[in-house]
A protein has these predicted regions:
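Asp-box/BNR beta-propeller blade signature and adjacent active/binding-site loops
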Residues: 1-372
Length: 372
């Protein structure tokens, strides 16, 4: 592997309201356009009152990017105003482009998104919209309710994707309500649509463990038909992270194999197929200076080895060893590099993208084009 070039899809350095960029995603449309979506805000933490969900478009394979587009006004949900936290796209067919957002209750806008006393989250909703003209216009946003986790805060963990059986897949995790005091059991969940993203259900709970949080799941469709799922993993008993864990489904996401230790330390992105039948994943290791690396597995995900350093931040930002959940959330709020993801461009090269910048509230949507 080698890096061919690096770039920035969007920098908010001259636009204060878009100064902090995070939650990056790239959707490649059938007409060759790239939609690079992300959260942009005046500040990263602690509240959500300045959040915007925007995207930029490239028509030349990530050589250049349009000015930012903000496609949706924050919706009213259950009679309450919201802010839009994240935006993702997936193309079902050329005439059915689906946008999926997370909207957050804005009536509590002065409060932190995460409640340190209860470990609950503000009300976080999933909504979808459809475009039949390639993103020129959009239908009204409609809320996704899941029977298994009705009315719970449901943060998305990455972009939706199309499974081999034609269903559209949402990836998310469950959280408890802001003031709920009961013990929180984290779940990573997939939900499915068989009608092009208009109705949702058939939820599959991928992880369910009282003591270990398999969170920030990154699920993806592999060429051979399997769905890969990989997790940033936190052991509540130890009060700190453990190795990344990995699993696969061979039945279109209806069930998953037992989780395995990937032997990698950090926060992963999505898994994609390598050109030689291997699997490739980007991940960020924050043990010292944050470093985005590429790892490869030649045995179907049983073991992984590092192959390339995509980006090194150049200085350590880890303040101390974590002691529990509140330390973890506090640390996440200060990150100014992270969320690495990967996609294969139409010319066969890889695009690894992530957010990075000089400070917590001043980060860009960055990427590297890599020859495998």
């Amino acid at each position: 592997m080698r890096i061919l070039r690096e770039g920035i899809a969007y920098s908010g350095k001259d636009t204060p309201k878009y100064s902090s960029c995070s939650f990056p995603s790239v959707c490649i449309l059938s007409d060759g356009r790239l939609f690079a979506s992300f959260k942009a805000a005046a500040r990263k933490i602690p509240d959500n009152k300045t959040d915007h969900a925007i995207y930029c478009v490239s028509t030349d394979n990530a050589e250049s990017w349009s000015d930012p587009i903000e496609p949706f006004e924050p919706p009213i949900v259950d009679g309450k105003p919201t802010t839009i936290r994240t935006l993702y796209f997936v193309e079902d067919t050329p005439d059915n482009l689906i946008a999926v957002i997370n909207a957050v209750d804005a009536t509590m806008e002065d409060l932190p998104y995460y409640n340190e006393e209860t470990e609950g989250l503000k009300p976080t909703y999933i909504l979808v919209s459809h475009s039949h003209d390639g993103g020129e216009s959009w239908s009204e946003l409609s809320r996704v309710q899941l029977d298994s986790y009705y009315d719970m805060p449901l943060p998305l963990t990455g972009a939706p994707f199309k499974a081999k059986d034609g269903r559209i897949v949402l990836q998310l995790e469950t959280n408890k309500h802001y003031y709920e005091t009961e013990y929180w059991v984290h779940h990573s969940v997939l939900a499915f649509s068989s009608d092009g993203g208009y109705t949702w259900g058939d939820e599959v709970t991928v992880t369910d463990n009282r003591d270990v949080y398999y969170w920030d799941q990154r699920a993806s469709q592999l060429a051979g038909g399997e769905i890969a799922d990989i997790f940033w993993t936190f052991d509540r008993r130890k009060g700190d992270y453990i190795n990344i864990h990995f699993t696969k489904s061979t039945d279109a996401g209806r069930s998953f194999a037992e989780l395995s230790d990937a032997g990698l330390v950090g926060q992963p992105g999505t898994v994609i197929d390598g050109g030689d039948g291997s699997l490739i994943v980007p991940y960020i290791n924050r043990d010292a200076s944050p470093e985005i690396r590429m790892a490869r597995s030649t045995d179907g995900g049983k073991s992984w080895r590092d192959e390339l350093v995509v980006y090194n931040f150049g200085r350590s930002i880890k303040e101390k060893q974590n002691a529990g959940m509140n330390d973890v959330w506090s640390e996440m709020g200060k990150f100014n590099v992270g969320h690495p993801f990967i996609t294969r461009l139409l010319d066969g090269n890889l695009m690894v993208y992530y957010y990075s910048g000089p400070s917590t509230h001043r980060t860009d949507f960055c990427y590297a084009i890599i020859e495998e």
